[in-house]
UniProtKB/Swiss-Prot annotation:
Positions of short motif DEAD box: 171-174
Main location as per UniProt: cytoplasm
UniProt entry tagged with the keyword Glycosyltransferase: no
Record CDD domains: DEADc_EIF4AII_EIF4AI_DDX2, SF2_C_DEAD
Subcellular locations according to the entry: Cytoplasm
Protein's job: ATP-dependent RNA helicase which is a subunit of the eIF4F complex involved in cap recognition and is required for mRNA binding to ribosome. In the current model of translation initiation, eIF4A unwinds RNA secondary structures in the 5'-UTR of mRNAs which is necessary to allow efficient binding of the small ribosomal subunit, and subsequent scanning for the initiator codon.
Taxonomic lineage from the root: Eukaryota, Fungi, Dikarya, Ascomycota, Saccharomycotina
Domain of life of the organism encoding this protein: Eukaryota
Family statement drawn from the similarity comment of this UniProt entry: Belongs to the DEAD box helicase family. eIF4A subfamily.
InterPro entries the UniProt entry points to: DEAD/DEAH_box_helicase_dom, EIF4A_DEADc, Helicase_ATP-bd, Helicase_C-like, P-loop_NTPase, RNA-helicase_DEAD-box_CS, RNA_helicase_DEAD_Q_motif
Catalytic activity: ATP + H2O = ADP + phosphate + H(+)
SMART domains with a match to the protein in the record: DEXDc, HELICc
Species assigned in the record: Vanderwaltozyma polyspora (strain ATCC 22028 / DSM 70294 / BCRC 21397 / CBS 2163 / NBRC 10782 / NRRL Y-8283 / UCD 57-17) (Kluyveromyces polysporus)
Name of the protein in its database record: ATP-dependent RNA helicase eIF4A
Motif annotated as Q motif, chain positions: 23-51
Length: 396
């Protein structure tokens, strides 16, 4: 993950109330062992969001940072957290929340890699693991990465001592502060020391979320990317008008007959649709995996491992996967169903071109979906073109 691989953002597209910009990691006064980890991980120069957000977080400001997927958000808060913690104190000091178990594990991997030369323990507090593991892991981990339900449960059961917490970081804040998680976030916040620093990072921050942040952030530094730049660089976006729902599968089969793709993620809106499509593709001799939130954790882990290793070429998913899973080989994302929430669109198509890798997103649109697609175009100030006849050339 070099600086060359991170999508660049024009200076004119950054809005902020903080004027310090640091263009080199060497100039951030990072601990020597952390700096070694940063370079060892493959970072060369800080991305636009890292240039602007790492320093104010380290300086203990509350920070609200908006950047699209693939811009180095995870590196931003991971580096800042590792700089702030005291490794001699064997107790949780930074709490990082993520909306899904998979994203929490991804963040944990990044933090561990960056902390390679440091005496730091990172514990993942997530569903699907035993409470015994949490009890042991939470004793001496300086950084805890977790999902809201499991973290809240552990704090209430006094397994997670929050006395030393000084940073509360929410990744994918638009999802975390949506109605499903808002109450849990508030509950966790009331159980943290009153001086706790709050950091929110996300690809989208709609107005209602910005209002919510005023309830628990103190004079935050705001670093916002203008909305009309949020569509990912390097992602070619197309649609196919399938007219009616019943024609989607035939259209998908025709598409696969005409293109050669290493790996693809196909998004559906419901578990039932995922299961139906998986069955149909399997019957058509495709090697397919599928994943959704109701699947047992162990199965989800195995499926993701198989897909990352390349033994499975097609992954069919609900929006569970649409946030932050780093699958580098994916060149094609197909929205078999348009997302019901337009803010999930950027998270879905971000799977195809993370960190500068080029990708193609193809949306299957029924006659009824045309209005929703136009809304997505308007929301992101982008254009989704009709898929051209020479589509095969994009995958050669």
């Amino acid at each position: 993950m070099s600086a060359e691989g991170v999508s660049e953002i024009e200076e004119s597209q950054i809005q902020t109330n903080y004027d310090k910009v640091v263009y080199k990691f060497d100039d951030m006064n990072l601990k020597d062992e952390l700096l070694k980890g940063v370079y060892g991980y493959g970072f060369e120069e800080p991305s636009a969001i890292q240039q602007r957000a790492i320093l104010p977080i380290v300086e203990e400001h509350d920070v609200l940072a908006q950047a699209q997927s693939g811009t180095g958000k995870t590196g931003t808060f991971s580096i800042a957290a590792l700089q702030r913690i005291d490794s001699s104190i064997k107790a949780p000091q930074a709490l990082i929340l993520a909306p899904t178990r998979e994203l929490a594990l991804q963040i944990q991997k990044v933090v561990i890699a960056l902390a390679f030369h440091m005496d730091v323990k990172v514990h993942a507090c997530i569903g699907g693991t035993s409470f015994v593991e949490d009890t042991e892991g939470l004793k001496d981990a300086q950084i805890v990465v977790g999902t809201p339900g499991r973290v809240s449960d552990n704090i209430q059961r006094h397994r997670f001592k929050t006395d030393n917490i000084k940073m509360f970081i929410l990744d994918e804040a638009d999802e975390m502060l949506s109605s499903g998680f808002r109450e849990q976030i508030y509950q966790i916040f009331t159980m943290l020391p009153p001086t706790t620093q709050v950091v929110l990072l996300s690809a989208t921050l709609p107005g209602d979320v910005l209002e919510v942040t005023t309830k628990f952030m103190r004079n935050p530094i705001r670093i916002l990317v203008k909305k009309d730049e949020l569509t990912l660089e390097g992602i070619k976006q197309f649609y196919i008008n399938v007219e009616e729902e019943q024609y989607k599968f035939d259209c998908l089969s025709d598409l696969y007959d005409s293109i050669s793709v290493t790996q693809a993620v196909i998004f559906c809106n419901t578990r039932r649709k995922v299961e139906e499509l998986t069955q149909k593709l399997t019957e058509s001799n495709f090697t397919v995996s599928s994943i959704y939130s109701d699947l047992p954790q162990q199965e989800r882990d195995v499926i993701m491992k198989e897909f990352r290793s390349g033994s499975s070429r097609i992954l069919i998913s609900t929006d569970l996967l649409a946030r932050g899973i780093d699958v580098q080989q994916v060149s094609l994302v197909i929205n078999y169903d348009l997302p019901t929430n337009k803010e999930n669109y950027i998270h879905r198509i971000g799977r195809g071109g993370r960190f500068g890798r080029k990708g193609v997103a193809i949306n299957f649109v029924t006659n009824e979906d045309v209005g929703a697609m136009r809304e997505i175009e308007k929301f992101y100030s982008t254009q989704i073109e009709e898929l051209p006849a020479d589509v095969a050339e994009m995958f050669t």
